[in-house]
């Protein structure tokens, strides 16, 4: 398979992100992935979710898997930008993409179902069947991909199939559909143990979808400038 997905488009106006998009600074990749759409083919259906929440990770900081050292299981983190790194988190699958520089990556923290002529309501129904609620009923759309393991479950993404692989535009890729968040929330990452760089503001959320992410950064009690920062489309992010 060619490394350039543009050479084998699944439909004429698909816009798969090239490897060069990912082979950049992890913070930049994490922010610019907001609004992009993950597409995964199951049979004749293209399941799709808009990326609404991401987290950046670096080799040299203590919150990353890569900081624990190279292993065969973590090898995707040390490959070129644009490799898929999947692992099990809290009993479910979790999706990451390697970024520029060995050990650096972006975690796809949550998404929101995406509907268009390619990924229609039949695809959405498949996603709901893959990720029902605790009673076995279709999960409401806003909560279907509201967390890293929920996202993978709804999208049918599995560690054994995709870990350490490259994107395949005929099966799995990230599509640039032209969506750009008008406002981005930057905050500290979630679930980082104390003493492992838990304070670093490496989490990005599409403000329009804050209510549908893993944990709403705009919930009651959170204070702008202390708990999070609001960034406009052109504003630089915090380092």
Swiss-Prot record:
GO terms for molecular function: alkylbase DNA N-glycosylase activity; DNA binding. Keywords: DNA damage, DNA repair, Hydrolase. It holds the Pfam family Pur_DNA_glyco. The keyword Hydrolase applies. The keyword DNA repair applies. One of its GO terms (biological process) is base-excision repair. Its EC number is 3.2.2.-. Belongs to the DNA glycosylase MPG family. This is Putative 3-methyladenine DNA glycosylase. The lineage of its organism: Bacteria, Pseudomonadati, Pseudomonadota, Gammaproteobacteria, Pseudomonadales.
């Amino acid at each position: 398979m060619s490394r350039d997905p543009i050479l084998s488009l699944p439909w004429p106006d698909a816009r798969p992100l090239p490897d060069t998009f990912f082979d950049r600074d992890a913070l930049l990749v994490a922010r610019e992935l907001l609004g992009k759409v993950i597409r995964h083919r199951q049979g004749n259906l293209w399941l799709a979710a808009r990326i609404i929440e991401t987290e950046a990770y670096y080799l040299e900081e203590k919150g990353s898997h890569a900081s624990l050292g190279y292993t065969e299981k973590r090898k995707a983190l040390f490959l070129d930008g644009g490799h898929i790194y999947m692992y099990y988190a809290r009993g479910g699958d979790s999706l990451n993409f390697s970024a520029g520089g060995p050990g650096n990556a972006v975690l796809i923290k949550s998404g929101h179902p995406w509907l268009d002529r390619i990924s229609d309501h039949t695809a959405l129904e498949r996603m709901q069947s893959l990720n029902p609620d605790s009673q076995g009923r279709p999960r409401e759309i806003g909560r279907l991909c509201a967390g890293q393991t929920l996202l993978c479950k709804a999208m049918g993404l599995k560690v054994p199939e995709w870990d350490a692989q490259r994107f395949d535009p005929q099966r799995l890729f990230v599509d640039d559909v032209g969506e750009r968040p008008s406002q981005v929330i930057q905050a500290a990452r979630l679930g980082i143990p104390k003493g492992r760089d838990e304070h670093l503001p490496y989490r990005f959320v599409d403000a329009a979808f804050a209510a549908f992410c893993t944990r709403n950064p705009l919930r009651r009690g959170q204070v702008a400038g202390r708990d999070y920062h609001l960034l406009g489309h052109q504003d630089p992010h915090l380092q």
